[in-house]
Structure formats: C-alpha cells, structure tokens
C-alpha cells in the first residue's frame, strides 16, 4: 500500500493498526486514533532537540529508579485495534525481552510526552491527548515556543500548566522526577521568556 490517497482516506473510513502498519516508510509519521488516520511530516530540528532533552532527563531518572524503560518515536504504542500512536517520548513499566523484541505487545505507557510543533499540534492536542487519557495514561504536552508544559492527568478536563519545573510522581518510584524547564529551553537555543 502506498501513501494514502483521497479515496483510501475517504470520510468515514476507519483505519486499523494493520492498515497503518502496511503504509510505506516515506518520512511521514502515520498513526491512527479511533480509526482516524493522522499524518505528520518529518519534525523540525527544534522539535527533535526538545525531544532529546526530555528523553535524556527522563531516561537518567527512570534508570536510576528502576521503574521501566524510556523510548521515543518512531517506536509504536498500540492502544487497541484502531489506535496506533508514536509518542515523542514515553515510559513503559519494566518489560522483558519478549516485549522489547516485539514478540508480545507492550503494556500501556506510564507517561507520554508529546512535543508540539506546527505539523502536529492539532493532532497531539485534539486527537492523541484525549485518547491517552481514556487509556489511563498521563500526558505532557511540551510547547517549546511558549516555553511551557501542560500536564494532563487521566481524569482531568484541564491541564496543569508549568513554566518553571515539571514533576512526575509514578507509583513505583521512591522519589518524584523533576525537570527544570529553563535549562531545556537554553539547551535547545531558545531565548528566555518572561
């Protein structure tokens, strides 16, 4: 199957995980949420730099706490038969070699982090974020241009907005993960706001 055309992506078509997995590796990110096909272009450098900074901070803490494994896109998360997503950064609980090799499905992530950019902000905010919440997954939306992080708890209809420090309190951890935001923005070359 080639890149989706208008007929394949006709209104009312319900995309499955299998449909998305059959799409080509052409530089676009293909996901489906509740059967809707989401296509995002390759990300900008700023997006990837922020992803890298968040990944590095989370990974160091998760490894030290021994609570799981941190992965990043294009790794896939399958939530159900009509929901395949590629979160920018996500934390899985401890998994074995069978999950890491793909022999068995991965459990739901403990945390998902999506970095907003012009090509994906609408999908991340309006499609993926509510889907994560319905699956019981905490979601952070990182807005580098506004230099803030929105924390969406699984049972919340409004985010907790943080501009200085973001914290995460997973059940299995002996202490919370905290990430100062100013060093992240500085690392990726953004001027200080406020």
Question: Where are the regions that the model predicts?
Answer:
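Gly/Pro/Ser/Thr-rich low-complexity, intrinsically disordered segments predominantly at protein N-termini
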Residues: 1-194
